[in-house]
Amino acid sequence: RVNEAAKGVLLAYAAGADLDQIAANFNVQRLVLAPANPSTLPPTPAVLEPDDDLRRRVQLAFEGLSTAGPEGAYVFHALGAHPDVLDASATSPAPGVVAVSVLSRVGSGAPAAPLLAAVAAALADENVRPLTDQVNVVAATIVNFTVVASLTLYPGPDSAVVLAEANARLTDYLARSRRLGRDVTRSGVFAALHAEGVQNVALAEPAADVVVTAAQAAFCTARTVNVTGTGE
């Protein structure tokens, strides 16, 4: 318990209310993704920003204090501009020009016009944007792919349990890969599907690594994972 309490004051390990307290020290508040609805039965609690997303914004907080226009400052202010912003990146295609790409939490990640407008307004603030910068807020390019895999299991384990675990691990990997500039690799999919009890994975799709730029994000449009038999 003492060790857990000690970790609770460290940004890398803090979670929940402990992380909220650390964030408050940096003048950063956890975003509300969906407000609570007390009129439902039972009442619907608010959906809050995940710990990992809040932790990242806290790590960027000092970048946000700069008025010189560093990459981290634009990313920090873009991430805090609206609860639907899942990720953002900043590049400079030409001197004095900044392109901020925005990835949405909603759907495939392609942001709607109102979300882009909210980010643009936040970055246009005179305390954020240097006078010499022309800031263009653009939608992230979504690179679609599918996952098609067949699993061979070791004899003994319940195939339904193993398949469910493999799918859960794949879901977690795809969620962590849903970021700008984050490749989805075949080795990553293999590793995710190799749950306890899986002897082999035959991966048909993606046929190659899904490689994306800082302005792109990979999105899985469909997935099919089947058990085809058992092996030694």
Predicted regions and their residues:
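Carbohydrate-recognition loop of C-type lectin domains
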Residues: 63-182, 231
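N-terminal polar alpha-helical/low-complexity "assembly arms" that mediate subunit docking
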Residues: 1-67, 161-232
